[in-house]
Design a protein with these regions (language model features):
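C-terminal accessory/binding modules appended to enzymatic or scaffolding proteins
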Residues: 380-394, 400, 406, 566-611, ...
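Accessory "access/gating" subregions that flank catalytic or transport cores
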Residues: 175-219, 373-374, 379, 387, ...
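Hydrophobic alpha-helical positions that pack around
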Residues: 276-402, 414
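Flexible inter-domain linker/hinge segments
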Residues: 126-192, 353-368
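Ferredoxin-type iron-sulfur electron-transfer modules in oxidoreductases and energy-metabolism complexes
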Residues: 3-27, 43-76, 87-89, 94-127, ...
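Gly-rich Lys/Arg/Thr-decorated short loops/hinges at beta-loop-alpha junctions or inter-strand turns
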Residues: 157-172, 225-237, 340-345, 387-392, ...
């Protein structure tokens, strides 16, 4: 096989683009083959569609191959995640623009006969919202208000087809960076774009790349992609690796050209087998085409990419722990300095960014820094992907411009809270993030605005909670996760999180006191100030944000000693006449004026007015107030 040249690559791109255009003369059926839809049965839908087409004499083509009668042929592809996970399995048909939701294998015959052959829309398979049918994907509210940059090809292409990626402009940004720009120019373009790391910290990517580039005395440098997505409920990076793996590879290759690195590592948790498979397929195909390896396109630049599977430890999402794991050491954070850009993997200068950050890079190089700056806010350019989960009508993968509000994401895109329930909170940023309230719904979602609220974007997990959620239980869940995932290296995190979890357990069991709330705050201050790594330093954010924003939930446990949400039963407060001395202290402390009576006579609680805040229970010096359970 002859070596690929720049001219050869351009010819490859031209041929692929022409093949893509020819393929569009026939129907293209895209079946979601992301992890979520596969679990819902999309592979059986794929197989049944092919069988039904074959039985009717339709020619099903693979890849971009196309010839013959367009009316008797079509392409059926397995794509990456479409994002609309609540409605999977999903089938998208182009050029009709039709999307079918919750498709079952037994629906395939009707799809072939009525839509693929008859051009008719099957209304029962379309998405419905508020009594309205939405046959076309672009009209569905979930998609209509998104701005897809990183996810543009996820769900729109065959994730394992290199030719299709190249046909849509893939690897042209790498070609441009390789031949038309030097390392300083690439770093400057990334800096000018305002791209900040999408893994949680929001550190400017261009500045990080430039720091590594300046180590000109060091012949060995590394590019590391963090695909160790450990936040509960997060699946943004997984979906990108599954749905558009070549964009991640291309971003890493451009980073290599910018900094002089020749080796790249993608660190992926072993719980993502489909992502690992598709990344490996992408690496193998890129290498076979001459896009990876030695002396790429005759430029003199060499680059190799390897996949390293992690064991799923949350702490390995921290940079120094991740590099230690790749080196074969136990995944534990290291004291800084030195920073990763100076002494990272095997002690060499290392660029470490996450999957979404690298996936943004090809678009920035091709379209320019000004284009990217035009999206988002002044301090947070571009878009951000979010995994929308919890008590929301439409869970799924969402991409919006930085600065979009929580209201737009949860209500306009996500469809709001199901079953007529009220919104209570949203947890953002995973175990290192915080819980926000209804009053925060109109805050812009960007790095700086969230920092002011004591929260972080993190990798992009959004867990929505309704009125039936006890926020103390939420705090306990995240503290249990963090304590269980603590590497144990530093005492503040190892022991401090254990003490916080014990305190939360005591509160949840209605055995706590107001002093426990002070204890939580004191422990949080100590852990935050003294923990070794960023994960430990932010471990208390879920607890502190719930204590600050939902203190009433804590008071139900430590004052009232009863939480109607946790106990699952209704209850009413009652004053025991045999114990009441008629001092009136309970009435004076009641914020709702729900308690009445005469001095030195038993008082009475009006449970229609009572909000069960526990103020009376805490004020009564005689223990005369009791909670009566009601079935």
């Amino acid at each position: 096989m002859s070596k690929l040249t720049r001219e050869g690559f351009r010819a490859m791109h031209q041929q692929a683009a022409e093949a893509l255009e020819r393929s569009r003369s026939s129907l293209n059926v895209l079946i979601c083959a992301g992890t979520g839809c596969i679990a819902s049965g999309s592979m059986k839908v794929y197989e049944n569609l092919r069988e039904e087409c074959a039985q009717r004499g339709l020619q099903v083509y693979v890849g971009l191959t196309h010839h013959g009668d367009a009316e008797k042929s079509l392409h059926i592809k397995m794509s990456g995640c479409h994002g609309f996970c609540e409605m999977g399995p999903l089938v998208h048909i182009e050029p009709l623009g039709v999307m079918y939701v919750r498709v079952k294998p037994e629906d395939c015959r009707e799809i072939v006969e009525r839509t693929l052959l008859g051009g008719e829309v099957i209304e029962r398979l379309t998405y419905h919202q508020d009594g309205v049918s939405y046959p076309r994907q672009e009209d569905i509210p979930f998609y209509k208000k998104q701005h897809r940059v990183v996810l543009a090809s996820c769900g729109a292409s065959d994730a394992e087809n290199l030719e299709e990626y190249i046909a849509k402009g893939g690897y042209t940004a790498f070609e441009k960076a390789l031949f038309d720009m030097d390392g300083a120019a690439i770093c400057r373009e990334i800096s000018d774009s305002g791209l900040r790391g999408r893994g949680g910290g929001g550190f400017p990517a261009g500045r990080k790349w430039e720091s590594v580039r300046r180590h000109t005395e060091e012949p060995v440098k590394y590019i590391v992609c963090n695909g160790d997505e450990g936040d509960p409920g997060a699946f943004m990076d997984r979906s990108i690796m599954e749905g558009d793996p070549h964009s991640v590879l291309e971003g890493m290759m451009i980073a290599g050209a910018a900094t002089g690195a020749t080796e790249g590592y993608i660190y992926v948790r072993a719980e993502y087998p489909l992502a690992v498979k598709r990344l490996q397929v992408a690496i193998d195909k890129a290498a076979a085409a001459g896009l990876l390896g030695d002396d790429i396109m005759g430029s003199g630049f060499s680059f190799h990419i390897h996949i390293n599977r992690g064991a799923g430890a949350f702490v390995c999402g921290e940079g120094s722990a991740l590099t230690a794991s790749i080196e074969g050491e136990r995944g534990m954070p290291r004291v800084k300095p030195p920073r990763t850009v100076d002494q990272g993997l095997w002690g060499k200068p290392t660029v470490l960014n996450n999957v979404e950050t690298f996936a943004n890079v090809p678009n920035i190089i091709n379209k320019g820094a000004a284009w990217y700056r035009g999206i988002g806010t002044e301090g947070s350019a571009g878009t951000k992907t979010f995994a929308l989960t919890g008590n929301v009508v439409n869970t799924g993968l969402v991409e919006v411009p930085m600065g979009a509000t929580l209201r737009e994401i949860i209500f306009d895109i996500g469809g709001g809270i199901p079953n007529g329930k009220k919104f209570k909170a949203v947890q953002i940023g995973g175990p290192s993030g915080g819980c926000l309230t209804e009053e925060h719904l109109d805050y812009p979602m960007d790095f700086d605005s969230l920092k002011k609220l004591g929260a972080i974007i993190g990798s992009g997990g959004l867990v929505v909670m309704d009125e039936d959620t006890c926020m103390v239980e939420v705090a306990r869940f995240f503290m249990h996760f963090t304590q269980n995932e603590s590497c144990g290296k530093c005492t503040p995190c190892r022991e401090g999180t254990k003490r916080m979890l014990e305190t939360l357990e005591r509160i949840i069991n209605n055995e706590g006191s107001l002093a426990d709330l002070d204890l939580l705050e004191s422990l949080s201050d100590t852990i935050t100030d003294t923990a070794l790594c960023g994960l430990g330093q932010t471990a208390c954010k879920p607890v502190m944000s719930t204590l600050r924003n939902f203190r009433q939930d804590y008071l139900r446990h430590v004052v009232d000693h009863h939480c109607p949400i946790c106990n699952g039963r209704k209850r009413r407060l009652e004053i025991k006449p045999e114990l009441c001395k008629g001092c009136g202290k309970c009435a004076r402390n009641c914020p709702m004026e729900a308690i009445s009576g005469q001095p030195r006579m038993p008082y009475v609680i009006d449970n229609e007015k009572c909000i069960h805040c526990g103020a009376c229970w805490g004020a009564c010096p005689f223990g005369a107030i009791d909670a009566i359970e009601e079935e």
